[in-house]
């Protein structure tokens, strides 16, 4: 059951509305979740249900304030512009993060490549009858 503490008012200072979710009908992971909503003048509040991020996971509640006007389109364009920034213009932490991600990708590619080679080698040995190695001991006396 959702409890609303202070009611929304149309004063110049937007009040903080918190929603505490605690009910026996929800799963244990979703009990006692609190979400703070900050309404601004001329906007309506939209609260989406909690989302479980992982199996063990944390509970994330997505809350968005949507105005009657279409102000969301400008935000989408700024996200696209942020993605197109070159590496030289990024701060040092972002550069290190990108280098680290690329290094991890290269390591994974190497592991996959080595595994593929190992499996091909096994396949060829099986075709010749030389795999598994324990079979070779049996074939010595033949």
Swiss-Prot record:
GO cellular component, one term: ribonucleoprotein complex
Alphabetical keyword list: Chloroplast, Plastid, Ribonucleoprotein, Ribosomal protein, RNA-binding, rRNA-binding, Transit peptide
Extent of the transit peptide: 1-62
Signal peptide (UniProt feature, chain positions): none
Record region (Disordered): 123-142
Gene Ontology annotations of biological process type: plastid translation
Molecular function per GO: rRNA binding
Compartments where found: Plastid, Chloroplast
Coiled-coil positions: none
InterPro entries: Ribosomal_cL37
Family, similarity comment: Belongs to the chloroplast-specific ribosomal protein cL37 family.
Subunit comment: Component of the chloroplast large ribosomal subunit (LSU). Mature 70S chloroplast ribosomes of higher plants consist of a small (30S) and a large (50S) subunit. The 30S small subunit contains 1 molecule of ribosomal RNA (16S rRNA) and 24 different proteins. The 50S large subunit contains 3 rRNA molecules (23S, 5S and 4.5S rRNA) and 33 different proteins.
Task performed by this protein: Component of the chloroplast ribosome (chloro-ribosome), a dedicated translation machinery responsible for the synthesis of chloroplast genome-encoded proteins, including proteins of the transcription and translation machinery and components of the photosynthetic apparatus.
Note: Three different forms exist, PSRP-5 alpha, PSRP-5 beta and PSRP-5 gamma, due to different transit peptide cleavage.
Name of the protein in question: Large ribosomal subunit protein cL37 alpha
Gene name of the record: PSRP5
């Amino acid at each position: 059951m959702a409890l609303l503490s202070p009611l929304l008012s149309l004063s110049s200072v937007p009040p903080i509305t918190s929603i505490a979710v605690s009910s026996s009908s929800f799963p244990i992971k979703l009990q006692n979740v609190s979400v703070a909503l900050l309404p601004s003048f001329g906007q309506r509040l939209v609260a989406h249900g909690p989302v479980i991020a992982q199996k063990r996971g944390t509970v994330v509640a997505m809350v968005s304030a949507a105005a009657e006007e279409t102000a969301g389109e400008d935000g989408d364009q700024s996200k696209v512009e942020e993605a197109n920034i070159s590496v030289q213009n990024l701060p040092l932490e972002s550069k290190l993060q990108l280098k680290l991600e690329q290094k991890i990708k290269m390591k994974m590619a190497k592991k996959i490549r080595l595994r593929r080679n190992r499996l091909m080698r096994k396949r060829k040995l099986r075709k010749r009858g030389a795999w598994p190695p324990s079979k070779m001991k049996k074939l010595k006396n033949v």
